Structure formats: structure tokens, C-alpha cells
Amino acid sequence: MGTVNITVSDGVRYAVADEGPNASEAVVCLHGFTGSKQSWTFLDEMLPDSRLIKIDCLGHGETDAPLNGKRYSTTRQVSDLAEIFDQLKLHKVKLIGYSMGGRLAYSFAMTYPERVSALVLESTTPGLKTLGERRERIMRDRKLADFILRDGLEAFVAYWENIPLFSSQQRLAEDIRYRIRSGRLRNNKIGLANSLTGMGTGSQPSLWSRVEEIDVPVLLICGEWDEKFCAINQEVHKMLPSSRIEIVPKAGHTVHVEQPRLFGKIVSEFLTSI
């Protein structure tokens, strides 16, 4: 089918890549902050027998970037996903979510458990545990959003690609780093700013108390150099003993970028096994 535009009930338009055999169940990929559906292109050849849905999340890529920051709330975006799946005639989905997309996957699975058959959660979190942590993060995200709007995308991307979270990307070949940078620059500054304030980790309700409600196969992925998210994944794994955890060598926060073939192999084997 290729890329299609799907309009949800309030008129917001989403860009969605729909590849592979037509089926009522699909693998759905949700990218991270500043990413796009292009982040997952490498999976086309690694999951050739699956219907693969890659979505530009709200405010990213070719999807609309509404001016109203409240439109970006996790609750609204979860509802958008349900509408998108309805229009694509998807009864069940296997969700792959990275970082921001992983938080969205957690929330969708909690809201529509009957529509999720598996979760692949890469370098992500069920949220921040305390109100104090959430308030602090909201303030940081507002400052970052102001920076984006004030100084523009180029200045923001130059800052963002050099934060400690992405330090391991400096080991990547220059052409790969250029591709990542170019993808980030194709975003909309209003969309990124509103994404930070509307569905940043601080704005999202904490789901830690509900993790044990998850009753589908779960694969947790993190890079060995990403100590923070490895610790989070270990904690989630203890709460979900039947989950599978993979700590990928020679990778940081963006495992699917730093070790794409190994990431694809791990995901393919997991999805085949369930």
C-alpha cells in the first residue's frame, strides 16, 4: 500500500506507511522524539512476512503539527492510534516502541489491552514515579520547547545530538550520523516543542503501578552503554517475570540505529516465537 494519509475524527492528518501482506494483525512501529517512520525502514527486509505499519507520531515527520499543545497529550494520541487501527482494519497489533514511542506503546497497551498481542519496548519507561520528578521534568521540557521555538531547529538539533544520552552515536559512521541529523531537521519546530510539553515524560501519567497488568508477551531491549534505561528495563522485567530482556552489546540508547541488524534479528526471533 505504501504511505497513506489517515485523518482522525478532529481532522488531524497522520502519515502512515503500510507495507507487507494485508492482514488484520500487524506489527506497528512507533518512533522516538525527533524521529519519524523512516527510522524503521530497515525492518522491511527483516520482517518480510509481516504487515508492517510505521507511523509518523503527532508533530513529527509528515504528520500534522497542531498549534494547540494540549492536543499532544498521551491520552489523545492513544485515541488517535485506536482510530488509525480502525481505519486500517487492524483488530490486533504487535507494538514496537522506542523511547517516546515506547511510552506511547505502554499507554496504548494499558488503555486497549484487548487490541495488543505483543510489546517490544526499546529504551523506554512506564514514566516517572514521583510527582516531584514529573514537575522537574515538565520544567526542563518547557525550557527545551522554548529553546526550539526561539532558536529554531538547526540550533536545537546541534544541541540535541550532543547530549549524553546519544554520546554513543558519535561512534557511528559519518554518513549514518548525517542521515540521523537530516531526519531530525525535517521535523517541524512547533510539532517538536508541543510534543515535549504535551507528552513529555513529565506530562505523562506514571504507569509504574499498572505494569503488572500487562498480560501479553513483552520484549525489553536496551543498549549496554545506556545504564539508566537498562536499570529501568531490569526493574520492569522483575515485575513481568515472563518478559524477555535483551541487553545489546556495543549500543547506547538508540539500539535500532547503532545495531540495526542485531536489533532486527532479536525482534524477528521474538515475534516468531510467540
Swiss-Prot record:
Residues 26-259 form the AB hydrolase-1 domain. It catalyses: 5-enolpyruvoyl-6-hydroxy-2-succinyl-cyclohex-3-ene-1-carboxylate = (1R,6R)-6-hydroxy-2-succinyl-cyclohexa-2,4-diene-1-carboxylate + pyruvate. Its EC number is 4.2.99.20. It comes from the Bacteria. GO terms for molecular function: 2-succinyl-6-hydroxy-2,4-cyclohexadiene-1-carboxylate synthase activity. GO terms for cellular component: membrane. InterPro entries: AB_hydrolase_1, AB_hydrolase_fold, Epox_hydrolase-like, SHCHC_synthase_MenH. Coiled coil: none annotated. Keywords: Lyase, Menaquinone biosynthesis. Pathway: Quinol/quinone metabolism; 1,4-dihydroxy-2-naphthoate biosynthesis; 1,4-dihydroxy-2-naphthoate from chorismate: step 3/7; Quinol/quinone metabolism; menaquinone biosynthesis. One of its GO terms (biological process) is menaquinone biosynthetic process. It holds the Pfam family Abhydrolase_1. Catalyzes a proton abstraction reaction that results in 2,5-elimination of pyruvate from 2-succinyl-5-enolpyruvyl-6-hydroxy-3-cyclohexene-1-carboxylate (SEPHCHC) and the formation of 2-succinyl-6-hydroxy-2,4-cyclohexadiene-1-carboxylate (SHCHC). Monomer. NCBIfam families: menH_SHCHC (TIGR03695). Belongs to the AB hydrolase superfamily. MenH family. This is Putative 2-succinyl-6-hydroxy-2,4-cyclohexadiene-1-carboxylate synthase. It comes from Bacillus subtilis (strain 168).
